[in-house]
């Protein structure tokens, strides 16, 4: 909430907060779920699948952006606000952080830890649904409807993929890293 809140966002650097959050979440997930990385397979197939998934999501979001802009007056300013967070920052640094830390850390936490453990406790379907809803609610603190809906759609896509193809977790991580 601190990173997105209209009240506090002017007092914190979004990218440093995301970096810190990514380190904490992925570190905690790794401590609580020791050895999770042993099942990762960064094969050529998973790399290609990750790229294809990211491109497919970009297509979905391109269409969604056009439709939302036609339907809602607030859509374009909210989307512009999301991309405006990159202004004044080193594009190389942001690309590095999103590719190698932030995107992968989100998947390690949300799918590799939260969804995996909720699925073990309540079954794969409920694990998917609950994780997707929590992922969306976390983004609601941004007070940005478009960001929250984007998180729900992307979270549902990655969650469904993890639900049915957990052995492709490396591809899911790659897709999130590229999509970011």
State the predicted function of each range:
Residues 1-35:
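Alpha-helical transmembrane segments in multi-pass membrane proteins
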Residues 7, 34-35, 39, 67-79, ...:
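Membrane-interface elements of multi-pass transporters and channels
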Residues 36-102, 120:
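Juxtamembrane helix-loop-helix connectors linking adjacent transmembrane helices
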Residues 1-3, 52-57, 128-130:
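Alpha-helical transmembrane segments
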Residues 4, 28, 32, 60-68, ...:
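Alpha-helical membrane-inserting segments
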Residues 11-18, 78-83, 147-156:
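Non-cytosolic membrane-interface motifs at loop->transmembrane helix junctions
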Residues 12-23, 49-63, 157:
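Alpha-helical transmembrane segments of integral membrane proteins, especially early/N-terminal helices
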Residues 88-180:
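Transmembrane helix-loop-helix hairpins at the membrane interface
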């Amino acid at each position: 909430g601190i990173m997105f809140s209209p009240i506090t966002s002017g007092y914190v650097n979004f990218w440093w907060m995301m970096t810190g959050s990514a380190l904490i979440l992925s570190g905690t997930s790794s401590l609580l779920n020791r050895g999770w990385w042993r099942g990762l397979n960064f094969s050529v197939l998973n790399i290609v699948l990750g790229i294809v998934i990211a491109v497919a999501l970009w297509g979905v979001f391109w269409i969604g952006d056009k439709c939302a802009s036609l339907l809602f007056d607030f859509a374009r300013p909210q989307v512009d606000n999301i991309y405006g967070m990159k202004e004044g920052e080193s594009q190389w640094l942001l690309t590095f952080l999103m590719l190698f830390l932030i995107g992968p850390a989100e998947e390690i936490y949300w799918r590799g830890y939260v969804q995996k453990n909720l699925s073990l406790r309540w079954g794969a379907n409920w694990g998917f649904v609950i994780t997707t809803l929590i992922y969306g609610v976390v983004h609601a603190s941004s007070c940005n409807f478009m960001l929250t809906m984007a998180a729900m759609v992307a979270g549902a896509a990655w969650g469904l993929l993890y639900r049915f193809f957990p052995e492709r977790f490396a591809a899911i991580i790659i897709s999130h890293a590229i999509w970011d």
